[in-house]
Amino acid sequence: MSGADLDNKLILGVCLGDCIHVAGLTKFLRIARQFGYQTQFIGAAVPPPVIIEKIKNSPAKIIALSYRLTPKVGLSLIKQFIHSIRHEKVIGRDYYLGCLPELAISTSKLDFFKKIFTGGEPMDEFYTIFQLESLNHTESPYPADLISRIKSKYPYPVIRAHFGLPSLDATFEGITEIAESKVLDIISIAPDQAAQEWFHHPDIIRKKPSGSGGVPIRTTEHLNALYKRSQTGNYPLLRIYSGTQDLIKNAELFHSSLHNAWAAIPIFWYSQLDGRGPLPIKNAIQDHFSAISWYALRNIPIEVNDPHQWGLRHATDQMVVADAYLSARIAKDLGVKWYIEQLMFNTPLGTSFNMDFARVLAMIDIVFPLIDENFTVFKETRTGLAYLATDPTVAKGQIAASTLFQLSVQPDIVHVVSYSEASHAATPNDVINSCKIVNTLIQDGVNNLPNYSFDKAIIKRKNELLEQAQEILEAFEVHGTHMGYENPYLSPECLSSAVRSGLFDAPQLKGFPGAKGEILTEIIDGKCVAVSSNGYEIDEEQRIRDLNIVEQMYSEENFRKQVLLND
């Protein structure tokens, strides 16, 4: 059959010789079908002459062979097969082999197979075969922006991980090592604390500690070098922390040097509220609004990394859900078109899997009504920062367990938290191995997991959270109306007042400027709830009433008016 008659979207699969191990081959064919290919499985333990005849009579462009027995015997069979292919002039095909690592070393020297698989390859190895064959290759065959990358990997999520070591040289080398491993799609550069706050102030930054919490980026050349080091392997996108001041200057610099894949900007945080920024809450919010608007004008995706910060400080589950809506609403009102909703699982520490999952579902549901043709939401999941143990063996299991639940919400982005997170800054090897764990789960489970959202206990809790989160939002809106704001979501004064008054509050905020820090919370039956000084759970309506900030919302007169309206 001539090359012109071959079907580029048809794959012929077969186990060679006496090999009966079909698991790896059938997985290869299954993944191919998910990318839109047609597949034909000839069978197991098929002699080379029979395979040759099947190939000659098939229009398949891609031929997938598997041999997972004794390498010495396999090498002899493969040499016989290659000789027959060349003798019979079965040309114009692409041949792939799955085998044991020892045999892969020998067969790679034969210069015949387009790709040899030994098991455990990252998803991008399959993507390279199945997705890129029909594309016009540029210098990088991988999409260079987040939206295209997400679409090209569907139904699989793209993978993101943090990386940044106290040494510039080690970070440069690590970026290249991670890129060449092809285990992820986005590397989030973690700059040190001095770079986040003082990059544009050289007289100050030179006096600050170097390498505290990340890589000591000090010049534009450092940023350019980071990008250059990433342009290999599967050409991962880069992104970086937005900083704690000079956000617009940072945005312009990161866009030009790193081609920043998306920006992560909070509403309340990275300010005096948590001690990680120099500005009072109100001023920080205004700066955050300006930065979000800058990115929105350029159609650069935005992640508002705010809700999980409340959860990490043991705010109630419903407060985290309310902030999920508030964050998305602000982004939409500021003109963001591509919005990334971060969903941190296992937060706060101590919540049960099912109640934690209910919170995540509530966060998704409360944002859903905002979606329209001008506002697209991508779901980004991650393992809880406080969830991981210092023992790496335990932490690996925790990553796997958390990821299984994450896949149940069909994320567009999976943020891989390295298993070393609780003990030390992730090395390239830590990042690569953590991503391998997650990639394996994704390959095995992306379309084959039970739907936990139908669990009755989860549904009940999700609905409770939606109702209580709505009470917080209604209180916030009424509070804003009393302050004279038509849209309180875009008022830094109203937002900072909501924290100052305790409407948004967390136990671990006590003592921080601009926060109340008086709420008491406990983990009860796997849920993070507000409690009285006696340890009894308080519902959200009672908590808000006790704050005395929106009294008329709960007054008898207002209640009677609402009854009359409903009648």
Please place each PLM-identified region on the residue numbering.
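Cofactor-cradling patches in redox/metallo enzymes
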Residues: 29, 34-116
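Long alpha-helical, hydrophobic tracts
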Residues: 278-282, 299-433
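Glycine-rich phosphate/diphosphate-binding loops that line cofactor/substrate pockets in enzymes
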Residues: 1-8, 52-59, 149-153
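C-terminal helical cap(s) of enzyme catalytic domains, especially alpha/beta-barrels
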Residues: 128-136, 198-208, 279, 356, ...
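Catalytic alpha/beta active-site cores
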Residues: 45, 49, 69-72, 93-96, ...
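Catalytic-core signal marking the mid-to-C-terminal active-site face
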Residues: 430-567
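ATP-dependent carboxylate/acyl-activation modules
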Residues: 2-42
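Surface-exposed amphipathic alpha-helices with a cationic face
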Residues: 33, 78-90, 222-233, 290-296, ...
